[in-house]
């Protein structure tokens, strides 16, 4: 079965249970421990849930930022500061986002970026949603890159092109896969 079909069949229970384990694994990584500023996506649809991760980031005193799609034609995004007082608004794709006037966090200040995916492989290649927002954003940062993916959505091999940025790690409920 193709990834899209598998993804649609994922139950909320499976996603919730896998997300809890994945969050625990992320919080135990060296990348998390070292990070002062973390950019984390807000989950949408069948993505690994991130609300517990964001809560822990705040509890651990880390500076949290989330993506804001600033140009849907050119597929450009920025990192915006996210606090427990930030009022989110529905974005261009129905994903909750910070308001456009929220403080921008420069890419070079971000230590860790937690990315969503449609699928990943064990070589730490990521298949995104196809718009290329992260592919355009990631070259501007030296942050550690970790994608969260349920094991059921892992692929044997993700095709890559010159614009794809390899990840440092992929975390599933079963393992942490590292590049190299």
Residues covered by each model-derived region:
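N-terminal active-site beta-alpha-beta segment that forms phosphate/nucleotide-binding
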Residues: 1-109
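Conserved phosphate- and dinucleotide-binding cores of soluble alpha/beta proteins
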Residues: 72-180
